[in-house]
Amino acid sequence: MQKFKSVEELVIQLRPEKPVYCIRKNSILSASTFFQNKFPGKILYAVKTNPHEEVIKTLLKSGIDQFDVASIKEIKGVRKFSRTAKCSYMHTVKSRESIKEAYFKYDIKTFALDTKDELMKIIESTNNAKDLELFVRVAVSNEHAE
């Protein structure tokens, strides 16, 4: 990955004709550290927001060690750099194969669901595992919301 001191330097050197993808690792580190110092709860980074490996590595370096993943590809992206980071499989509709792979190959214990069918799929695909952490999404009426 090429490094530049500024966007201006990048533009002068590359003279790009198409958009250029830039990752500002120091900004990621700074924002992550600030948020961790101010937020008292657990932080899960949603990998789908930016799954680039440099972003994942930078977040891990900053101390973020929990990730909201929505696919096996995202799990692999985190596991490439950390075997111990907690990945929570938060996509509410998953294939039986991806549940099995997540649980048995990547040691994922946390899953989201919003239907009984998805619950049964998770239970069956993990062979009735007793170490699951399940997040159930509940739809509530918003008829009185303002």
Feature annotation, model-predicted:
Residues 1-110, 116-132:
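A charged N-terminal "starter" segment
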Residues 133-139:
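ATP-grasp fold ATP-binding core
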